[in-house]
């Protein structure tokens, strides 16, 4: 699956529902979202059961991290619907750098939550570093790395600052 395909899927969702907020998108798509306070190290999960998509999010996470997890799980629903119909995806075992589904869901979350225009404006000049870029946009470094990689691979001229790590949510 190409980065451009992921980006185009997000564009279609945003145009159709008029929002980039993952919780609003999940609601508009009739996905049941539940917060669980006993998930321990699991950040979230998505599953398909009885012809209905469900997303579970760790209720102990800070609100901004819950938004990232919601966007990530939405990515699984949009990009990996068939895989979800076969088996639920839990985000303790799936934050694996070698997993293409996790990489794609992280890319989806980054492109959904961070607009190209905002990143370009915040980047400003060649002296911008990852820390100041994240601070100005209120973004986690791992998420920002995925966004920068997406923009770079789509030819938007943003330099890559570090290698993307699909496990960035697992460490928090």
Model-derived features: where do they sit?
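Active-site hotspot residues in diverse enzymes, especially metal/ion-binding acidic/histidine motifs
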Residues: 1-172
